[in-house]
Regions:
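Beta-strand elements within well-structured catalytic alpha/beta cores of enzymes
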Residues: 27, 38-44, 71, 78, ...
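Soluble non-cytosolic domains of exported or imported proteins
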Residues: 14-22, 65-75, 149-150, 176
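Histidine-centered active-site microenvironments of extracellular/periplasmic hydrolases
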Residues: 51-54, 60-70, 83-139, 151
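Formylglycine-dependent
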Residues: 1-38, 45-56
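The feature captures the short pre-catalytic strand/loop hairpin that immediately precedes
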Residues: 3-8, 133-142
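Short, solvent-exposed turn/loop segments enriched in Gly/Ser/Thr/Pro and often Arg
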Residues: 41-51, 98-104, 178, 201-206
């Protein structure tokens, strides 16, 4: 197992228990050194994906075993990153998006997708419908909820619009991604139809397929 930064191996092997801490430290350093100009930070934590191993300082701190320990640390690390945005006076001018990529792992203690059927690798909603939290103080009202049909492919055109970026001017003749701008929906704008009125298609790991409309 190797841990890379750009094209350089920085740890071999690496300690899987400390990855969330390492990623957060790197992210905070990036924010601190990039604060003078607009920046984009993509932070794909590996936790709580398998293999689930708790940080030594977080071991046995939850009431839900090692999975709970890992999630509690993840919550803490995200809080550290949000605190950094506040300390650097970037909180009001930074869009934060947090989401999962799929439903829970089957056949594990924490494998619950209630009230939906299906889990990871399934085309049912328990495998494909995931939480997504968006924070942008002053533009997105805190505490609002939406059940609108949104896909991860909608993030690029939505965030580009929010940042005043015309994707067509940057595509150099190539087709713009199929995603849609759902910014009005995220802002809770009434009277504006939700942009995604078409369908989404998924295929499950067992060959099962589904269309969501």
């Amino acid at each position: 197992r190797e841990l890379w930064r750009d094209d350089e191996v920085i740890a071999k092997p690496f300690d899987n228990r400390r990855l969330t801490e390492i990623f957060t430290t790197e992210a905070i350093e990036f924010v601190n050194t990039s604060k003078a100009r607009p920046f984009f930070l993509y932070l794909p934590f590996t936790a709580p994906h398998f293999p689930v191993e708790a940080h030594p300082e977080w071991k046995d701190r939850s009431q839900f075993g090692v999975f709970g320990d890992v999630v509690e640390e993840l919550d803490h690390r995200i809080g550290q990153l949000l605190d950094t945005l506040k300390e650097q006076h970037l909180e009001e001018n930074t869009i934060v998006v947090f989401l999962s990529d799929n439903g829970p792992e089957p056949l594990t203690r924490e494998s619950r997708a209630d009230p939906f059927r299906g889990k990871k690798w399934s085309a049912l909603e328990g495998g494909t419908r995931v939480p997504c939290l968006v924070r942008y103080p002053g533009s997105i009202k805190a505490g609002q909820e939406s059940a609108a049909l949104i896909s991860a492919i909608d993030l690029l055109p939505t965030l580009a619009h929010a940042c005043g970026i015309d994707l067509r001017k940057h595509s150099k003749g190539s087709p713009v991604i199929d995603g849609l701008n759902v910014w009005p929906t995220l802002r809770g704008k009434e009277g504006i139809p939700h942009a995604r009125q078409d369908l989404l298609y998924w295929h499950g790991g067992d060959g099962f397929q589904a269309i969501r409309m």
